[in-house]
Amino acid sequence: MQQADMTAKIASGKGFIAALDQSGGSTPKALLGYGIEESAYSGDDEMFGLIHQMRSRIITSPAFTGEKVLGAILFEKTMDGTVDGKPTPAALIERGVVPFIKIDKGLEAEANGVQMMKPMPDLDALLSRAKGLGVFGTKERSVINLANREGIAAIVKQQFEVAQQVRAGGLMPIIEPEVNIKSPERAQADQILLEEILKALDALPEGEQVMLKLSLPEKSGLFDPLVDHPKVLRVVALSGGFKRPEACVELAKNRGVIASFSRALLEDLRHQMSDEEFNASLASAIDEIYEASVDKVPA
């Protein structure tokens, strides 16, 4: 797949984006969900080795192809690793899946009801390395806990500044200002976020595009103006703590928004499964998320 093919696939392809980008902090939880206790490994190297085995098993599964999975978001160590003897991004591209990389370095402490992204001093070097490996885009996450306009405006400003740096590095940014679905002010936070993103999009130069990864809104259809915006390549949704059936029901209510699920994709997979069981379970999850993304049919 050339750059133009990847852009076209992400812009209008039928399917969803798999999020396989758990980082150091969330890896023990991901492994536990997969059926591997913390006592089964010692030290980061063993931990990352196990999570890489899990991701390799997913990526090489017969169901994990570009037919239903448009793209996959990787953690930096996964990007630098190999699958079937090939660099992970190349292995994905071979399967028709567009590679993205998570670039943020975690969250600052909460202030003004939000958590900004920590500084990324080595971002240009990472972007250059990712570009060299055939990666198409990036993803960067911050979190909104309360409907504080000052805080949300600061989050959006920071996200679009990082996106500009990503575009300058030749990659497509996925901007992810996650609204905490447990927030007591969720609906108001969704609305303020929409307004601030629209302002930032209008300020982008003509011809520039970004992607958006957003929490499923409390009010269905709220993000229609973003789906229709010429400066947005695609709007994707995170599962944000919803279990897969619930996430798919919510997703199906939102026109033009496709999934970019992590936990909701992987929640039924277990280390102990035979390959046959594992592949069947993953195929079932992919089908369910595909239908909610494309056909807008909740499971």
Predicted segments, located by residue:
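Alpha/beta catalytic barrel-like cores
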Residues: M1-F136, I144-L146, E196-A299
